[in-house]
Swiss-Prot record:
InterPro entries: Ribosomal_uL4 (IPR002136), Ribosomal_uL4-like (IPR013005), Ribosomal_uL4_dom_sf (IPR023574). Residues 46-71 are annotated as: Disordered. GO terms for biological process: translation. SUPFAM superfamilies: Ribosomal protein L4. GO terms for cellular component: ribonucleoprotein complex; ribosome. This is Large ribosomal subunit protein uL4. One of the primary rRNA binding proteins, this protein initially binds near the 5'-end of the 23S rRNA. It is important during the early stages of 50S assembly. It makes multiple contacts with different domains of the 23S rRNA in the assembled 50S subunit and ribosome. The lineage of its organism: Bacteria, Pseudomonadati, Pseudomonadota, Gammaproteobacteria, Alteromonadales. The gene is rplD. Keywords: Ribonucleoprotein, Ribosomal protein, RNA-binding, rRNA-binding. Part of the 50S ribosomal subunit. NCBIfam families: rplD_bact (TIGR03953). The keyword Ribosomal protein applies. Belongs to the universal ribosomal protein uL4 family. Gene3D superfamilies: 3.40.1370.10.
Length: 201
């Protein structure tokens, strides 16, 4: 199959497997959920009454003081006491094998092509790390909510996009399924397309 370049009068021959496969919603959902879960720290921790440092002695006698009866100072009703159902550190990570991950990426890329949300250009760069210059360039291409994918990290492009809302710059190695579906359009250079094919082959 062919992808037409927006800034050149030629088409790019690409693999049907990478850019023309059916959309597997269940697979994409599973991989996106796993990706988000793997980003979680899961390091929160609270103490139960058993883990609180302090005496187990009864604070005052049962009867005769006029105060409410109390058996200890570490209960959840007390200031500084334990938490009833204390949160514990946990591992939220989910295993996704390479074949599934690659399959999800190819499924997303194919759907972007079908929906005409994948914009392929010969090359894309800015001369200086200026947000104004990048904004004007994107406006000329009628792009606003866009993920820019280049073959290698372009520092000028990265710095220029850093202060733009709904614009992100990634190299092929930094591609992930969540970023691909988070933006309205995905702008990819011809070199990046070739790298993506090699990566997912």
């Amino acid at each position: 199959m062919e992808l037409v370049l927006k800034d050149a009068s030629r088409a790019l021959e690409v693999s049907e497997t990478t850019f023309g496969r059916d959309f597997n919603e269940a697979l994409v959902h599973q991989v996106v959920v796993a990706y988000a879960a793997n980003a979680r720290q899961g390091t929160r921790a609270q103490k139960t009454r058993a883990e609180i440092t302090g005496t187990g002695k009864k604070p005052w006698r049962q009867k005769g003081t006029g105060r409410a009866r109390a058996g200890g100072i570490k209960g959840p009703l007390w200031r500084g006491g334990g938490v009833t159902f204390a949160a514990k550190t946990q591992d939220h990570s989910q295993k996704v094998n390479k074949k599934m991950y690659r399959g999800a990426l190819m499924s997303i890329l194919s759907e972007l092509v079908r929906q005409e949300r994948l914009v392929v250009v010969e090359q894309f760069a800015v001369e200086a790390p200026k947000t104004k210059e990048l904004k004007a360039k994107l406006k000329a291409m009628d792009l606003e909510d866009v993920l820019i994918v280049t073959a290698e990290v372009d520092e000028n492009l990265f710095l220029a996009a850093r202060n733009l809302y709904k614009v992100d710059v990634r190299d092929v190695a930094g591609l992930d399924p969540v970023s691909l579906i988070a933006f309205n359009k995905v702008l990819v250079t011809a070199d990046a397309v070739k790298q993506i094919e090699e990566m997912l082959a």
